[in-house]
A protein has these predicted regions:
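Short functional micro-motifs and their immediate structural scaffolds
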Residues: 258-262, 289
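Residues immediately within or flanking Cys/His clusters that coordinate Zn2+
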Residues: 250, 278
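Active-site-proximal loop/helix segment associated with metal-binding centers of metalloenzymes
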Residues: 90, 104-181
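Core catalytic region of metal-dependent phosphoesterases/phosphodiesterases
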Residues: 5, 10-103, 176
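Active-site neighborhood of phospho(di)ester-bond hydrolases with catalytic His/Asp-centered motifs
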Residues: 4-6, 26-31, 56-63, 95-96, ...
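Active-site environment of divalent metal-dependent phosphoester hydrolases
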Residues: 9-15, 33-38, 62-69, 101, ...
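Conserved beta-sheet core of the metallophosphoesterase superfamily
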Residues: 55-59, 77-78, 163-232
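Short metal-binding segments enriched for Cys and/or His
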Residues: 280-301
Length: 303
């Protein structure tokens, strides 16, 4: 079966309880986190993922090196198209941008890449930034030439068409005029020229549906059934919903809107100046938080 989830950024806790087999495929919609440091840290993560029985089918995000730029990867034929793999980690598959695959009986077009809004900050601090994080002009033209007027079942991308941008996720401190939206404009063209049934993307760290496009983040969905796979904390059976919750005056559960909640700070976890928290709802049995690893130890004992 085919499953799909959003950005992982090196956090793979969500896959631990699934019990999938060698015939199952897990799509990660970019920013996977295994080609980020380009050193032993990446290798340790890959060694962990190597133990899973199922295959990971990864899309290129903006916070990772392209596999074609890493010497250990080589190009092979798989699922009716070209992919990148490493001999040591055959279940960790990276899609090639612009390729059309046949997976689980579905035709799937892959378009990775996006702009990093924190590019200048990363460069100034000496953090990783990847200069070819976005598709080149030639890559974009090739995709339009190849697929205009054609039908595909599914489009997988990291970012989204411009018209679908989730403005509620924009940073108020960052003027949008400073953001390179060339990929989003390009994906607008793709949407206009390519006939498709469903589109999945990541990048924005939220879950939302806009027409036939679905933003994915922390949850896992079965593409075959359209149902989300519950993501459980083994200690208490509460479903984990990986949404970003910033420190503010929460009075109600983000999901069921009930007031039977407990708020836990994530061990001082701080991102872009915001303290992130976990909201634990005793009514709908869900935990809302930014990062499983940070808040899982903080779940109250009474749960």
């Amino acid at each position: 079966m085919l499953y799909i989830t959003g950005d992982t950024h090196g956090d793979f806790y969500r896959f631990g309880h699934l019990g999938l087999n060698k015939d199952d495929i897990m799509v990660i919609l970019g920013d996977v986190g295994i080609n980020y440091y380009l050193d032993e840290c990446d290798k340790k993560l890959k060694e962990r993922l190597k133990r899973y029985n199922f295959k990971f089918f990864c899309i290129q995000g903006n916070h990772e090196e392209r596999p074609e730029n890493i010497s250990s990867y080589h190009e092979v034929e798989m699922f009716g198209g070209k992919v990148f793999v490493e001999d040591e980690y055959p279940n960790l598959i990276f899609a090639k941008n612009g390729e059309l695959y046949n997976i689980d009986g579905k035709s799937i077009l892959v378009i990775g890449g996006a702009y990093s809004i924190d590019k200048d900050y990363r460069i100034s601090k000496g953090y990783q930034w990847f200069k070819d994080e976005q598709l080149t002009e030639q890559e974009r033209l090739d995709i339009l030439d190849k697929y205009s007027g054609k039908h595909v079942d599914i489009i997988l991308s990291h970012t989204c068409p411009l018209r679908c941008e989730p403005k509620e996720s924009f940073k108020l401190s960052l003027p949008q005029i400073a953001v390179d939206k060339s990929m989003e404009y390009f994906l607008n063209e793709v949407e206009q020229r390519v006939d498709y049934d469903k589109w999945y993307c990541g990048h924005y760290h939220l879950e939302k549906i806009v027409d036939k496009l679905e933003f994915m983040f922390g949850r896992i969905k079965s593409v075959d059934t359209g149902e989300f796979i519950p993501k459980y904390d083994f200690h208490n059976g509460y479903e984990i919903v990986r949404d970003a919750c910033s420190q503010k005056d929460y009075k109600y559960c983000p999901g069921c809107k009930g007031d039977n909640i407990i708020i836990e700070k994530c061990e001082g976890h701080n991102i872009n100046g915001l303290d992130f928290i976990a909201i634990i709802c005793n009514d709908c049995k869900k935990v809302y938080g930014f990062n499983d690893v940070n808040y899982k130890p903080n779940c109250p004992k009474e749960l």
